[in-house]
UniProtKB/Swiss-Prot annotation:
Tissue-by-tissue expression: Found throughout the plant.
Pfam families linked to this entry: EF-hand_7, Pkinase
Binding site for Ca(2+) 2: 384, 386, 388, 390, 395
Binding positions for Ca(2+) 4 per the UniProt entry: 454, 456, 458, 460, 465
Segments for region (Autoinhibitory domain): 298-328
GO cellular component, one term: cytoplasm
Protein name: Calcium-dependent protein kinase SK5
Residue span(s) of domain EF-hand: 335-370, 371-406, 407-442, 443-476
Domain annotation Protein kinase: ranges: 34-292
CDD domains from the UniProt entry: EFh (cd00051), STKc_CAMK (cd05117)
Annotated domain remarks: There are 3 contiguous domains conserved in the CDPK subfamily: a kinase domain, an autoinhibitory (junction) domain and a calmodulin-like domain. The autoinhibitory domain (298-328) inactivates kinase activity under calcium-free conditions.
Active site: 158 (proton acceptor)
EC number: 2.7.11.1
Length: 508
């Protein structure tokens, strides 16, 4: 059972208008696009159905949230935030991908990829407990999702086995996180007081009504305890009894199967279920714990953050590609970039509307980056399109928006049309010159720019050449691509040669 209460409820504005909407724009009726089928599950706030896309026959899951359950303005905001967070995280390999959102007068519908392998919880029930190797593999995936959330300024707040699904019924199926209905954006150092979560998994500081992202690591520690033993660490016949046990914090490592569980596994659990959130392991530290690393399941070198990964990719693009991405970023829907907006605000600590070098350095440090100042300066220069010395909001969105969004045909056509002012079907030298002027770019070698993209050497860029440029080099890029003068050709060379320092991370 998920709990949700907030001290702000006394000032809540009750929504009385029948025509209140969650999404900023009206959508098609979901039944025009999908055939809604059998019921898959029922949650506290919504019902999930299987649905089939009429055009392709593809199978998806649809979470429908009835508006009659949205009693106040905050409830509507919660659903909108869930949608933003899912868009923000859904490119991660272990997060359920959101396909689209629909709304009518009675409900909001979230269409997601269909995971047919069932809940993690069900597999725990079936097996009783996993081997340490199986548990380590699963908890690594879960904590990678937690690390991804935290690096993006998102706190999940309801981690439990039921919120992780396997994509297939196979033994080696991929585990995916779902249900971000209680998740929130947060800033470093920010504390929360509303009691949310599920009884067995809730952290002691949540019960004390003063908590931050450390509470997610506690919940993951509870999941690990269950993965190894088949029972929760804090158990009682009633919710108040469970909460008392959590606040007491006494762990049982004497009952079966704990005597046969390795000391290293128990050490990790103790450090994840530390009563003090300040000394509790972070998600990053969990992934470096010997029990995980020594099993050769997690890499021995910590992954850099998503922000760093995207900035590195961005630094490998040529100038035209950067301008095109800026054009696309400005056309993305609000729900697609809502999470990035929050991330920008988190890094922009003085709320000036721009990110300075020091703010970028501090922001990267907070997400575990170990870059030298010169490397951070290269990233800053790469993102700072207009060379103002700071990164404004538009530049930040352009530098961090997931590159998969580039490849959508409608976005590429829109960006091409922006540069092709006369609608001739070609981008000419003069048109690029005008675009550089519009973007405040000086000292640009336009001939070299065209030469790099112009495959048939006719001195101009057609749509096919433009689309090819935009789609190339969008994979993981290694550490060496941060050189200030790096161009697209160099970046492609690194990708083709298979750099062994590929940056993956939560924007995968």
């Amino acid at each position: 059972m998920a709990a949700k209460s907030s001290s702000s409820s006394t000032t809540t504005n009750v929504v009385t208008l029948k025509a209140a909407w969650v999404l900023p724009q009206r959508t098609q009726n979901i039944r025009e696009v999908y055939e809604v089928g059998r019921k898959l599950g029922q949650g506290q706030f919504g019902t999930t159905f299987e649905c089939t896309r009429r055009a392709s026959g593809g199978k998806f899951a649809c979470k429908s949230i009835p508006k009659r359950k949205l009693l106040c303005k905050e409830d509507y905001e919660d659903v909108w935030r869930e949608i933003q967070i899912m868009h923000h995280l859904s490119e991660h390999a272990n997060v359920v991908r959101i396909e689209g959102t629909y709304e009518d007068s009675t409900a909001v519908h979230l269409v997601m990829e269909l995971c047919e392998g069932g809940e993690l919880f069900d597999r725990i029930v079936q097996k009783g407990h996993y081997s340490e190797r199986q548990a380590a593999r699963l908890i690594k995936t879960i904590v990678e999702v937690v690390e991804a959330c935290h690096s993006l300024g998102v706190m999940h707040r309801d981690l439990k086995p039921e919120n992780f699904l396997f994509d297939t019924i196979d033994e080696d199926a991929k585990l995916k996180a779902t249900d971000f209905g209680l998740s929130v954006f947060y800033k470093p150092g920010e504390s929360f007081c509303d009691v949310v979560g599920s009884p067995y998994y809730v952290a002691p500081e949540v019960l004390r009504k003063l908590y931050g992202p450390e509470s997610d690591v506690w919940s993951a520690g509870v999941i690990l305890y269950i993965l190894l033993s088949g029972v929760p660490p804090f158990w009682a016949e009633s919710e108040p009894g469970i909460f008392r046990q959590i606040l007491l914090g006494k762990l049982d490592f004497h009952s079966e199967p704990w005597p046969s569980i390795s000391d290293s596994a128990k050490d990790l659990i103790r450090k994840m279920l530390d009563q003090n959130p300040k000394t509790r392991l972070t998600a990053h530290e969990v992934l470096r714990h010997p029990w995980i690393v020594d099993d050769n399941i997690a890499p021995d070198k910590p992954l850099d953050s998503a922000v760093l990964s995207r900035l590195k990719q961005f630094s490998a693009m040529n100038k035209l590609k950067k301008m095109a991405l800026r054009v696309i970023a400005e056309r993305l829907s609000e729900e697609e970039i809502g999470g990035l907006k929050e991330l920008f605000k988190m890094i922009d600590t003085d709320n000036s509307g721009t990110i300075t070098f020091d703010e970028l350095k501090d922001g990267l440090k907070r997400v575990g980056s170990e870059l030298m100042e010169s490397e951070i300066k290269d990233l800053m220069d790469a993102a700072d399109i207009d060379k103002s010395g700071t990164i404004d909001y538009g530049e930040f969105i352009a530098a961090t928006v997931h590159l998969n969004k580039l490849e959508r045909e409608e976005n590429l056509v829109s960006a091409f049309s922006y540069f092709d002012k006369d609608g001739s079907g070609y981008i000419t030298l003069d048109e690029i010159q005008q675009a550089c002027k519009d973007f405040g770019l000086d000292d640009i070698h336009i001939d070299d720019m065209i030469k790099e993209i112009d495959q048939d050497n006719d001195g101009q860029i057609d749509y096919g050449e433009f689309a090819a440029m935009m789609r190339k080099g969008n994979g993981g890029i290694g550490r060496r691509t941060m050189r200030k003068t790096l161009n697209l050709r160099d970046a492609l060379g690194l990708v083709d040669n298979g750099s062994n320092q590929v940056i993956e991370g939560y924007f995968k």
